[in-house]
Amino acid sequence: MVDGLITVNGKQYFIKYDMNTICEMKLDGLDVMALSTGELELDFIQLRSLFYYGLKKIQRDQIKSKEDAGYVMSDYLESEGNIEDLTNVMVNALVRSLGFKEGK
């Protein structure tokens, strides 16, 4: 698997975060620094938001809303993956964007 890449129903999606995205997430109430210190536990609303922000950098023409991201997330979970694998892909992409070494 390529880092940050997931396949859903034969279509590839790349999850990537940059500093502008991380700041936008904070403004939206999703503090990734609290996540990195263990102060924040993700619920499904936050997971969908994290997924949306990761997709919107590269797939902005296809993923225009959190609901769009939720549909892709549901398709992934129904057809090809599980929530733990998807969460690991998102967290590892986020860790790389912050300049830390990847962890599991």
How does the language model describe each region?
Residues 16-17:
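Short linear motifs in exposed loops
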Residues 1-12, 23, 27-42, 62-104:
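Charged interaction scaffolds used for protein-protein
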Residues 46-57, 92:
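Short, hydrophobic/amphipathic alpha-helical patches that form generic packing surfaces
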Residues 20:
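N-terminal glycine-rich flavin-associated loop
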